[in-house]
Curated annotation (Swiss-Prot):
Organism: Drosophila simulans (Fruit fly)
Nucleotide-binding among keywords: yes
GO cellular component: cytosol
Active site: 250 (glycyl thioester intermediate)
Entry annotated with the keyword rRNA processing: no
Keywords recorded for this protein, A-Z: ATP-binding, Metal-binding, Nucleotide-binding, Ubl conjugation pathway, Zinc
Protein's recorded name: Ubiquitin-like modifier-activating enzyme 5
Amino acid sequence: MSHAIDELQAIIADLKTELETEPKSSVGVASNSRLARDRIDRMSAEVVDSNPYSRLMALQRMNIVKDYERIRDKAVAIVGVGGVGSVTADMLTRCGIGKLILFDYDKVELDNMNRLFFTPDQAGLSKVAAAAATLSFINPDVEIETHNYNITTVENFDRFLDTISQGGRIAGQPVDLVLSCVDNFEARMAINAACNERNLNWFESGVSENAVSGHIQFIRPGDTACFACAPPLVVAENIDEKTLKREGVCAASLPTTMGITAGFLVQNALKYLLNFGEVSDYLGYNALSDFFPKMTLKPNPQCDDRNCIVRQKEFQARPKPVVIEEKAVSEEPLHATNEWGIELVAEDAPQSNPTPAETPVMGEGLRLAYEAPEKSSETSEETVTAATADETSLEDLMAQMKSM
């Protein structure tokens, strides 16, 4: 018996040695054959192949963004690193975000491979650890912080609340934006409660179970509807989501729909963080008909979240911007029967003579290149009379021509 135990211990020791000597790339970290680049202190607009930020900084040259490098001062929290969340983190990392805080308690499985970002060699790793390793290799300039726990439990909710309230780019400051990429209503309600309590703007996102539609919603506490203002039936009826799931049945998943939803999410997050363009309050996507609905949801005065009611009152108490409207001057028509304002003049009305322009006073030694001759009204009348007297009929002219 003791001999068998010794053999098992020897096998375990060999496996540990093999694991330690295995290339780090097998667990999602860059190996010596794939050296990560050095950190870059400042973003440069120099157009060279070795500059990873040249195409991003081109947004300044094209007057889309005033100061793109401000993105390095921003911190974003992503809750849920699945099909939408992992792609969202990937895009923000490539855009050069200053800090990413990732929340998830799940592991990478082989059934995740139909989605984007994760690779089969990362199966078994926690999603936040696998994501952090890959993202750090893509852009080592981004500060990445990971939290591997469920935010919906009582003890972990307080940790989540403290992290988004004090985990900003500057220590002790809140994050600039929270992105919800979770796949259940319980987690969405937890994020909603935290952001309402700390008055943080956040985006909610989701993909339908049939994988052919998705949406994003920008929630500004007090200004727009929170997730509890117009809850889905599962939330409103306090139904346990776990009772709805059946054994052997899973939700459908398409990387295309998730990629499109993540793209909408990051695009609007960038517009909000860098202050360009128009941020959509709600943007949906229906893949079957390529339909993209947009709308704005107003907050519910009878919302069940007491912090939402507080934020609504605070928003209503804010001074509204004064909009100065220019009063339009209405031009009344000159004639009641003429809606176009055309002035009618009688045929026998005397024609007004134009007032001759005054000759400017010239300095000494200066003269005008041309001076228009002055015409008096008497001269004009004499000219017209003479022209009338000299008029000859057509018959007389023809007779004169024949006699020549």
